[in-house]
């Protein structure tokens, strides 16, 4: 079983060309977070990658379904208690602290 675990934990190598000043900045930030350079860079890159992919969510629809979607977006919503509450609640940036 140790062989299977070691295979699952194996990491690939990623080489980067970086200016010394940038490397020093990353090292200082990693130290401030109590991490080594590799873990700090990997964590930051992974977070940025996940954010980029979340922002790029794509919904696929055939032309008829997309047209129906647009029609529904243009329709005036029926009044209801939840909508009234939402419209009467100040936005977070409008609320007094």
Swiss-Prot record:
The keyword Transcription applies. Signal peptide: none annotated. Keywords: DNA-binding, Repressor, Toxin-antitoxin system, Transcription, Transcription regulation. The keyword DNA-binding applies. This is Antitoxin TacA2. The neutralization domain (ND) is sufficient to counteract the toxic effect of its cognate toxin, although other regions also play a role. Exchanging the C-terminus (probably the last 17 residue) for those in TacA1 (probably 15 residues) allows the chimera to neutralize TacT1. Homodimer. Forms a complex with cognate toxin TacT2. Forms a 4:2 antitoxin:toxin complex with cognate toxin TacT2. One of its GO terms (molecular function) is DNA binding. GO terms for biological process: regulation of DNA-templated transcription. Residues 58-97 are annotated as: Neutralization domain. SUPFAM superfamilies: Ribbon-helix-helix. Antitoxin component of a type II toxin-antitoxin (TA) system. Counteracts the toxic effect of cognate toxin TacT2, but not TacT1 or TacT3. Plays a role in persister cell formation. Induction: The tacA2-tacT2 operon is up-regulated about 15-fold in a relA-spoT-dependent manner within 30 minutes of phagocytosis by mouse bone marrow-derived macrophages. Disruption phenotype: Deleting the operon causes 90% reduction in persister cell formation in mouse bone marrow-derived macrophages. All 3 tacA-tacT operons can be deleted without an effect on growth in cell culture. Belongs to the TacA antitoxin family.
